[in-house]
Regions:
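Glycoside hydrolase catalytic-domain context in secreted enzymes
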Residues: 1-523
Length: 523
């Protein structure tokens, strides 16, 4: 599908038939023929000059004719608009031409608004109404199969109660999945399992106390998450001692130490009070209110609303809290948004942001005094699809490797929880950092700042266990000589901290296997 940063204009061309049929197509073919999927999504990029959602070769000849697929083809969100907009492929003149071409090539359903032009396309003779009927029939057949036209009592899954969400059975399943995914890459000299009883353990690294990292991409929002730090802390015996020292961030030499937990609402509840309106002007009463207890990670991609009852488009939100720092210094209010809004401190607007074409980072630095209360209000509005709002606040600290090593000098073992994060690797992200571009990774090595800290711990004579969290391979060649054990924990979900701790202390025997090759280094 091409690089994330230019996929709206990228052209995959001169693909040899052998590569196409032996490398790129087999996973899709298996899902269609063996998995019997009912819906297939076409990509943003071009294939041999044609946008994938307008490719007869892919959607008609291969998918429908060769593989016999008779289900729905859905565009990726905004992909049809890429046919004609300036920052897209520009293969078509307008929405009418693009929509007609997509339907004629077999794209039945659009995620976006370009298909609104189909009525005019029919009037202009760019597509026959009978061709539109073919797509409409497929869509209606799918809705019939889902029971959308039947009485609720006739549809088996309408009787499933909401209480199954986050039920005990599902919590147990989350733990079981996390356990089974744990993959022990290396264990020298019986470094693992760790022995309880008078143990002093240091937990370090950017992923040790990050619940959001554990959720991965396109995730739900679990009501509770056991971080890896939490899991280790709960697994210790009464005679054991834990030292927590983050040490560094993922990539940058300056790290923000979150103080989100110092935010409380006016009635004393943790986090922010959220109010939502199904319009961008905040007319009328809010349609819903909610409590946000963790740093914000909201996104409407995949038809995920910010809160139950809130529109996917044409909505607004206001978040309020009182921040009371326990130390003085400079606090960074960190915003990453796809939409418009403003940040107010004590009623004064200190930062505005507006971006309707992808995510944009915005930050504000405030000198705070310990014990003083600061009213924080964040507004957000969006009227199109794919709204995004990430927000956190914290003290910005420069990485000091020497001091971090000194702080864990009494530890018998250091568990370094590192790797990368869904905030760095994912779909079309506004990330431009060493080793990362737009959601892609440009280097498979462990980020340099983490590598430096692990090396310093090794040189100080510390026994190091590396817990690597990532959704893709990491080159770990230097770490194999500097660590006693390496555990690949992936993005382990809401119960990930419990599963990692069970492996570290020998309460669960890891049996996971790598589904992808972990190369030793980039060469």
């Amino acid at each position: 599908s091409g690089p994330e940063w230019n996929r709206h204009e990228f052209n995959a061309e001169n693909i040899k038939p052998r590569d196409l049929y032996e490398t790129y197509l087999p996973p899709f073919e298996a899902l269609v023929k063996e998995g019997k999927v009912k819906e297939v999504m076409c990509a943003y990029n071009r294939f041999e000059g044609d946008p994938c959602c307008g490719s007869d070769r892919l959607l008609m000849q291969i998918l429908r004719d060769e593989w016999g697929f008779d289900g729905i083809v859905l565009s990726d969100c905004g992909a049809i608009a890429d046919f004609y907009r300036d920052y897209g492929h520009k293969t078509h003149l307008d929405a009418e031409s693009a929509s007609a071409a997509a339907v004629l090539s077999g794209t039945d359903l659009e995620c976006g608004s370009s298909y609104e032009a189909l009525v005019e396309a029919v009037k202009q003779g760019k597509i026959d109404e009978k061709a539109v009927d073919v797509a409409v029939k497929r869509l209606l057949m799918a809705r019939f199969a889902l029971g959308e036209m039947d009485e609720p009592e006739k549809v088996s899954w309408t009787g499933i109660p909401f209480s199954v969400v986050a039920s005990a059975g599902h919590d147990s399943l989350a733990l079981d999945m996390a356990r089974k995914s744990m993959t022990l890459l290396m264990n020298k000299d019986n470094t693992l399992p760790l022995k309880r009883g008078g143990l002093t353990i240091a937990v370090m690294g950017p992923n040790a106390n990050d619940s959001v990292m554990q959720w991965g991409n396109y995730n739900g929002m679990p009501p509770h998450t056991v971080t890896i730090l939490d899991g280790i802390r709960k697994a210790l015996g009464s005679d054991d001692r834990l030292i927590y020292e983050q040490g560094c961030g993922w990539v940058e030499r300056a790290q923000i130490q979150s103080v989100f937990n110092r935010c409380k609402t006016a009635d004393g509840k943790p986090g922010f009070t959220a109010r939502y309106w199904n319009n961008v002007t905040r007319d009328g009463e809010p349609v819903t209110t909610a409590q946000v207890t963790t740093p914000f990670h909201f996104c409407t991609s995949g038809a995920t609303v910010f809160a139950p009852g809130v529109n996917l488009t044409d909505f607004s939100a206001t978040y309020n809290s009182v921040f009371t720092p326990d130390q003085s210094g400079e606090v960074v209010f960190d915003i990453y948004a796809y939409g418009s809004g403003r940040l107010r401190i004590n009623g004064e607007e200190v930062r505005g942001f507006s971006n309707q074409h992808g995510g944009q980072k915005s930050a504000y630095t405030l000198q705070v005094q310990a014990g003083k209360m600061y009213d924080v209000e964040l507004d957000f509005e969006y009227f199109r699809s794919d709204a995004l709002l990430n927000f956190d606040l914290g003290f910005k600290n420069e990485v000091d490797v020497r001091k971090s090593v000194e702080r864990v000098k009494d530890a018998d073992v250091v568990v370094f929880v590192g790797g990368v994060s869904p905030n760095l690797e994912g779909e079309e992200m506004g990330v431009e950092l060493p080793g990362f571009r737009g959601g892609d990774r440009t280097d498979i090595e462990l980020p340099a700042v983490q590598r430096e800290l692990i090396a310093a711990l090794h040189h100080a004579g510390k026994k190091v266990v590396l817990v690597n969290c990532s959704g893709s391979p990491i080159g770990l060649e230097p770490e194999t000589g500097r660590c006693g054990a390496i555990l690949q924990a992936w993005y382990p979900g809401q119960a990930g901290g419990t599963a990692v701790a069970e492996v570290l202390f020998g309460d669960y025997n890891p049996a996971g296997r790598l589904p992808v090759t972990f190369y030793r280094n980039v060469s």
